[in-house]
């Protein structure tokens, strides 16, 4: 087993702090509307140019093994904030750096790290309460657009995101993809879509678009393979008498059952289309239940004692229209009971809150969106590959920020919400004493750091800006873009409360742990043996 290296006390803490500072200094130049960009080298392909804190943090590995541990801990702050809120990673990094710096300074001066950390935690709790109290709900397209525009530094992006969310609702799915044009386009799919197409091209009704379009169809949802036509005949007769098309969603449709459907379609006897059910295993069952609830039908399954040959029209789902291509099926305006659909949505939301798996969370989110209505796709294009990556990143961040704003509301941007939270922490200082008070004072000082950094990145004096904003009313702050002081909410400079809150909580969590560290254990880098020299082969 390889030996380990250790550092103790001040030496250990200083090494961690150097690592924290190196990462934070690389990230904080990007803060605010006049923040700069960072170029990231890639082993393969062109470099990435970005102003996204978490993307920069993820790329940083330091040579010194002890400093690197400090950098990796700070990286955790950015990553966690990104996971929870999707934005605010640079703010979180700036906050963590100042709490670590001030905390370690006080520990070196003799403060007890554990009591200090208690003070930090109490102050953060008060500040978070103050941020929540400042939050205002957002409604209307304009406010949604402003959140997106601030995050992406682009009004066009803000407007496209607002349009997408307006169409699919706040629970709907909005995907960001690479487009073929130079601008930003929005595509929208109404209704529920799943990624299974027709089982045979003979089902196509629109030859130009190669689509099977069924108007006002019945929908059979069967959790089984259908190959025996005798099982299907009683139901086919009922559907023919009703003079409506039929969509069959089953585990598979094959053999004579599939042949019968195709022959009847080609003869013009009656119109139908068969598709495979989406997903696999347990997830397939859940998705079939979703489709049944959306269309007002039942899942025909042997598990519940329901047999295909005994199925009645009343057990089938209905929809205004179904469009099937070779790759996917879209059900528009399912005839399900709105109350049942709402109940199912709430059930999925409850599952979302309890799941630990990112994969499950993504799949549940997809199911939720399909039930809640529609899928929007934002297609991002650019002149070069490098610009495309950067632009796509900004749109994804802006989308996350907008969702966070819809969830917990908005606060004044530009670091003002954090600065205003100082008042609540200031009141707490009177109740505390000793090292706890010192810990709370560290948070009090940290709350002004983001606004100071935004001002300095814009070429202004941070201390003067902080004093001026502190003396102002509610949401008056420094607009780094114009260089003036104004009502930031009215000017559209706003941040999601969730982003601001998460940035502070995650920064304090990691910084508090760093401050209480006394020993660092690290494994030295193994030296790679030199490559053997390639000499000439021997000759006879």
Swiss-Prot record:
Binding annotation for ATP: 30-33, 87-91, 414, 479-481, 495
**Which GO MF term does the entry hold, naming one?**
ATP-dependent protein folding chaperone
Q: What is its EC number?
A: 5.6.1.7
Q: Which Pfam families match?
A: Cpn60_TCP1
Supply the CDD domains for this chain. Answer: GroEL
Q: Which GO terms describe its cellular component?
A: cytoplasm
Where does the UniProt annotation locate this protein?
Cytoplasm
Query: What is a biological process (GO) this protein takes part in?
Result: protein refolding
Catalysed reaction, written as an equation: ATP + H2O + a folded polypeptide = ADP + phosphate + an unfolded polypeptide
Q: What domain of life does the native source organism fall in?
A: Bacteria
Q: Which protein family is named in the record?
A: Belongs to the chaperonin (HSP60) family.
Partners and quaternary state?
Forms a cylinder of 14 subunits composed of two heptameric rings stacked back-to-back. Interacts with the co-chaperonin GroES.
Q: What is this protein called?
A: Chaperonin GroEL
Q: Identify the taxonomic lineage of the organism of origin.
A: Bacteria, Bacillati, Actinomycetota, Rubrobacteria, Rubrobacterales
